[in-house]
Design a protein with these regions (language model features):
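A structural "domain/chain start" motif
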Residues: 16-19, 23-138, 230-233
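Short secondary-structure boundary motifs at beta->alpha junctions and helix caps
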Residues: 184-229
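Mid-chain, structured segments of secreted extracytoplasmic proteins
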Residues: 1-25
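Solvent-exposed, acidic/flexible segments
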Residues: 42, 125-133, 173, 203-214, ...
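A short beta-strand signature
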Residues: 173-184
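A short, hydrophobic beta-strand-centered structural micro-motif
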Residues: 3-11, 120, 147-168
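A short, structured loop/turn motif at beta-sheet edges
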Residues: 151-156, 182-189
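Short, solvent-exposed beta-strand/turn "edge" segments of beta-rich domains on protein surfaces
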Residues: 18, 167-171
């Protein structure tokens, strides 16, 4: 059995098979008719895709452009799904969309190209032995962005502020949280996130608490940002 949903079915006149006491009819598809009926669905998906894709190509901010290309790729997948069904109905007519397929297949390379121009300077407050700084640097690099050493070189500044959220004494407890904001050179905020440690860390000195908490906290930051960057950019 096929799981393909049949479209624009037509049927022959039914006939009665006396021996089985059943009616039978043959189902068939006229490809031209089926294509004519299904084509508007393809065109709707095409229009939706190019609305996002064209807007992305006109966006001046690099990160926003990456994000919009990512959205256009998601829309493009819907377009491709409808084309695949259209190919079943009429492969010759579907072949007329080959240039659109090329446009969609080229989007990942476009995104990577834009990312390589997204230079990022990381400015962080409240870190311990640069543990979170290193984690943020790795996330940006692994996501395709380029981290630079000075703000003058950067197209974007990643401002990060860590709050320890100290409570108690002897032992004291900390439960770090971080606020992250990415601004472009025009002071426009492009990305924000707030990440909190999943548990408190107890110790008899602040330094020992930080030493224990920050490696685990940096892993939490890395995992969440890696996922969010992959989804958005």
């Amino acid at each position: 059995m096929s799981d393909v949903e049949l479209f624009a079915l037509e049927y022959t006149q039914g006939y009665y098979f006396k021996k089985e006491k059943k009616w039978y009819s043959l189902a068939f598809i006229k490809r031209e008719n089926a294509w004519t009926q299904y084509k508007p669905k393809i065109e709707d998906a095409k229009t939706a895709f190019y609305a996002i894709y064209d807007a992305a190509s006109k966006e001046e901010d690099l990160l926003l452009r990456c994000s919009m290309y990512k959205k256009s790729l998601e829309s493009g997948q819907i377009f491709l799904q409808r084309l695949e069904y259209g190919r079943i109905l009429n492969s010759e007519k579907e072949a007329e969309y080959k240039e659109d397929r090329k446009v969609i297949s080229g989007i990942p390379a476009l995104i990577e190209k834009e990312k390589s121009s997204c230079t990022v300077f990381i400015e962080i407050q409240g870190d311990y032995e640069r543990i979170v700084q290193s984690a943020l640097t790795e996330v940006f690099k692994n996501s395709g962005f380029r981290v630079v050493r000075s703000e003058n070189e950067a197209a974007y500044t990643c401002n990060a502020y860590i709050e320890l959220n100290i409570s108690g004494a002897e032992p004291l407890a900390i439960k770090p949280g971080i606020e992250i904001r990415i601004d472009n050179n025009h002071k426009q905020t492009i990305f924000t996130n707030q990440i909190n440690s999943t548990e408190k860390t107890l110790a008899y000195s602040l330094e020992k608490a930080q030493k224990k908490a920050f490696p685990l906290f940096s892993e939490t930051i890395s995992e969440e940002l890696k996922t969010e960057f992959a989804d958005r950019f």
